[in-house]
């Protein structure tokens, strides 16, 4: 079965004009696994794909996304537990059904001195509404989630219902990747599915998350009119994915954290003199000396904090709003917005940097 699945992936890559560079058996240490994890221990391999010359990183990742989704639809019937952790030029995902403090022991790669990164996203909580599975271990491809999406059934139903009207110049073959969200995964995995589709269609991860998990804007008389127009424009096309939810997310450009509008999950941050920032739900995650800290705080309901990894810039909630409101003339867009889904969702999504 493994050989068949690998062949399916290779064919999907070739369809997107991508060249396979090779496969690697990922070193693992099963001795740290519990009984259930050992009984379901998967075969773990890493794929390497050459980037074609003269295409952008964004286009490369979009092709990888399409290849992955087509492959997943093909091999699902062969093995429903087969799973592609990530297929991206920006990030790599190490996940497992093991205790958090032994993840680096399970994956010796993480102990290798040559392993280096400017940003890392991790998750140490355990599922409360789904049975543990290797493929459902967090983080997912873009996000990790603390809490629940209590509107998940409605969000899934609307995503599937609207998918026939989704269209984007960036994803001309979007019908090939139906269903666009998982119906049998966790609530967090479904949110991750929706986030990656919106990014592949041309939205930034920050803008996409503000559409999916907006603040309470309707009755906020202090909110900038242009920002309110942004949220009103997208409210006609996407219902809020309501928590309580604390979300951390990362792609090659941004690392960010946001709370849903209820604000019932903690998200605390610390910034140090040597330009390190740590955002976590628990204070005990970081142990910086007091004299090394220049700022600390917590996110409020509906707020977001992000780091532009390319520019090395911290974006607070106001800067994020300034960025997304300048992406399009949303007040004017509202004049042409209809609540009808038949107008095409992704095609009417102005994308901001």
Map each language-model feature to its residues.
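Short, glycine-/Ser/Thr-/acidic-enriched flexible segments
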Residues: 1, 99, 126-128, 148-150, ...
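Conserved catalytic micro-motifs used in adenylation/nucleotidyl-transfer and phosphoryl/amide-
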Residues: 120, 132-149, 153, 239-278
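Catalytic or ion-translocation cores adjacent to nucleophile or general acid/base/metal-coordination motifs
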Residues: 150-195, 230, 268-283, 287-291
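Phosphate/diphosphate-binding loops
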Residues: 232-236, 246-247, 283-317
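Short, compositionally biased
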Residues: 159-172, 316-335
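Hydrophobic alpha-helical segments, chiefly the membrane-spanning helices
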Residues: 347-352
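Extended, highly charged
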Residues: 1-118, 122-124, 128, 174-241
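Conserved small/polar residues in nucleotide/adenosyl-binding loops
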Residues: 336-343
